[in-house]
Amino acid sequence: MREILHITTHMGGGVGKVLSGLLAAFAAEGGDHHELLLLEEPEKRNFFDLLAEAGVAAHVEQDAAKIAEAMARADIVQLEWWHHPRMVRFLLELPPVPARLVLWAHVSGAFYPWLPPAFLRVPQRFVFTSAYSYKNPFWDAAQRTWAKEHAAMVNSVGDFSAEEPRHEAHAGFSVGYVGTLSYAKLHPDFVRFCARVKDICGVFFRLVGDAQNEARIRRDAAPFGLAEQLSFAGYVTDVAAELRRMDVFAYLLNPQHFGTTENVLLEAMNAGLAVVALDQCAEKHLVRHGETGLLVRTPEEFEQALRRLYAHPEERARLGRNARRYIEENFSVGRTAAHLNAVYDAVMKREKTMCDFTGMGKDPHEVFLNFLPPPLREGFAQGSVPKELPEILLGESKSSVRHFARLFPADEMLCGWAREIVQRRGGGAR
């Protein structure tokens, strides 16, 4: 029986759903012993509690020396990576330790947080969660080829319901979205897309997710006269109940978003919903246009898709049936577990080596810079904040400048950049 130690920053959002479903599936299989170590106390305990119910050992540990001891005891160590500054701090503090290291990247690495090619060589096995990562626009041909030959790809799939899809009757035509409401993930022109179809009879837009960006979305929607057609559910634990009350699932993401497997999109497809997503990034590797959903490129194409689906409920039903069958056949926690077991089998054939993360950067601000895509990194080269920054770097979380500065308060460079951003935004900069 192999001892496999998973190290994650937290159990929030999509990662929490994936890890709880995956580790519960491993526990049900028997065989290997999996243990989960968190670097932060869970803010929401729903996924954490699911692990306890499944008999999976999970606890919080922040002492790097104690974690190193656990790593040395394990046969395999799997890092759950999305460039969270708490994980960065742990790796910078980690003493030398021998391990068979697997790094499972829960971000595409195509934009920010970027994946430097050299970082892929640190673990014995680097594992992507989307085929889109192989097409990183800031790698050259040789780097893409190396990734294709040496990095694995395992979709980070959570546990989807096996129940037959149910649709609850409701008034109007419900166009739904579930996920992060920050414009770092949601398309910055989301309300502009919605405005194209606001005259559809009874249409309303149901947004499910933490309400931290609700005021801004409402403000952006006001000029389009959309205020009465926006409905915010806030964070919910029963996503399935929300999906049952939707007619179409509209997944309009920032063209430079960081996502990969997009479990909530797959969950909507599993629920038998007709999905409309942008023809970009990871989404185009998950939705088959015209078969399991619709892919659009512009607000005009989105309008055409929504009007078509409104006018033809039988088309919504066809796409939903196909989507459900596609998820059943191609995306399951069992398949994810099997693919990861194959990775573990390969890694076990190798000897433990000393974990060395010094190549990430010698200082926290250097690590931050090294995981920016090259054009953004060049903008910081003069020591000040570039005038134009993507939304993800301006926020409070999601590995933003201020997020890094909070975790590394002694790093004067990071703190200076954070102060500059706060001053700009206080003066009306966005």
Model regions and ranges:
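Short hydrophobic beta-strand element within catalytic cores of glycosyltransferases
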Residues: 37-38, 270, 274-277
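Nucleotide-activated donor-binding/catalytic signature segment of Leloir-type glycosyltransferases, i.e.
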Residues: 53-57, 217-236
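Nucleotide-sugar-dependent
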Residues: 252-266, 278-285
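Conserved acidic donor-binding segment of nucleotide-sugar-dependent glycosyltransferases
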Residues: 289-290, 294-300, 308-313
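C-terminal amphipathic helix plus adjacent low-complexity
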Residues: 329, 334, 338-430
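A conserved mid-protein helix/loop that constitutes part of the nucleotide-sugar donor-binding site
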Residues: 16-24, 173, 182-196
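Acidic donor-binding loop of glycosyltransferase active sites
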Residues: 74-76, 244-260, 273
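A short, active-site helix/loop in glycosyltransferases that binds the activated sugar's phosphate group
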Residues: 111-116, 121-150, 160-161
